Amino acid sequence: MKFLAVLLAAGMLAFLGAVICIIASVPLAASPARALPGGTDNASAASAAGAPGPQRSLSALQGAGGSAGPSVLPGEPAASVFPPPPGPLLSRFLCTPLAAACPSGAEQGDAAGERAELLLLQSTAEQLRQTALQQEARIRADRDTIRELTGKLGRCESGLPRGLQDAGPRRDTMADGAWDSPALLVELENAVRALRDRIERIEQELPARGNLSSSAPAPAVPTALHSKMDELEGQLLAKVLALEKERAALSHGSHQQRQEVEKELDALQGRVAELEHGSSAYSPPDAFKVSIPIRNNYMYARVRKAVPELYAFTACMWLRSRSGGSGQGTPFSYSVPGQANEIVLLEAGLEPMELLINDKVAQLPLSLKDSNWHHICIAWTTRDGLWSAYQDGELRGSGENLAAWHPIKPHGILILGQEQDTLGGRFDATQAFVGDIAQFNLWDHALTPAQVLGIANCTGPLMGNVLPWEDKLVEAFGGAKKAAFDVCKRRAKA
């Protein structure tokens, strides 16, 4: 029984102790605002209440049991007898009250820092404003420079001859190299227009960049912009100078071209006058000539008769070249399917006259550079590839192994005045014949030297048994003309 009574008493004491602790801690949790201002720990709170921290804790424990008030030490003022002002009850067992933050001198320091920062921001804004004004002035100067350069470019473009600006594609001639310059001029104009468009886009972007510069603190932007503007100005000036040089070159080239055109027109007018005063009917049928007044790739004559397979041939004709010393071109060419150079008589540039058979070449010692009428005959046989060349009835050269044992293929196209790169076409102006052709005849055998001399002297005229020179068999194209002409009567008058 005593043991049970002791256990019961101990339990009650433990229960009372727990209740006292709970009651002592309730004011701290319920009223945190009662903490002393500026207190940061238990010792400072206890000293502000006028009692040491440990004694306050003990008195809190004793207050639940009705203990007496605080004792008065000798020598203390009487006022200390009175209870201290209400403050937070501290507990060393549960928690420590935290005092509310109170204003300190840091607030005054923060206010001074804000004022300094405001002054710094104002100073920075003023610097940015000055930078923006300087940039705007530079932009205006750049804009004036761009307008001035654009005006110069417009004056250069407007100063070009309209004929050069509107020059379109034309037919190929020996002077085609000079007419390639307008294409280069158009390319330069396109490049200048592209630069002008870029400059206009930059002008449109400049106001927006000027507005943004007031808020952007980077002075490198104007530097990059100015460097780009300087680069564009340099490119534009280079283009303008190149355009002026090209204009001067084109003016010189156009003057020369104009002289050549006038010369060609005079030649054409002479042909027209010759046709107007000539006979309208050819008598006999072979008394005509084919005239090609200028070197080009579109004037020629075509023989309207098929050529059979040949194992030998003789081609004779009267020629008068008007090309001077720049090469006589191609008096005639015969092409077949699969071989454009089946038979070609050609003189290109400063090279001697050549005879091509199946792309095999033999050089002929003939000369037509004096602008006079000459009688030319070429004879060839497939056996051993023997060939002979006659000028004005005289044998000038001979040889062998020219396309030996190769028969001339049939069903080809024979062209007077042009060299064929394909069957019946794709002429090259640099290889064209300029002058007059008459009495072109083709035989299927080699003529004797006596027969050739008789034809050249007009003492024994012969008509080709494969291709005779007849008006109905020869058709002119591209401006080539047929006119009345009798070479034997001309020689008789001379």
Curated annotation (Swiss-Prot):
Binding site for Ca(2+) 1: 341, 419-421
Glycosylation site list: 42, 211, 457
Quaternary context: Interacts with KLHL2. Heteropentamer with NPTX1 and/or NPTX2. Also binds taipoxin-associated calcium-binding protein 49 (TCBP49/RCN2).
Span list, region Disordered: 37-80
Function: May be involved in mediating uptake of synaptic material during synapse remodeling or in mediating the synaptic clustering of AMPA glutamate receptors at a subset of excitatory synapses.
This protein's GO CC annotations: extracellular space; glutamatergic synapse; plasma membrane
Residue spans of biased composition, Low complexity class: 43-62, 69-80
Compartments it resides in: Membrane
GO BP annotation list: neuron projection development; neurotransmitter receptor localization to postsynaptic specialization membrane; regulation of postsynaptic specialization assembly; response to hydrogen peroxide
Species assigned in the record: Rattus norvegicus
Alphabetized SMART domains for the sequence: PTX (SM00159)
Listed name of the protein: Neuronal pentraxin receptor
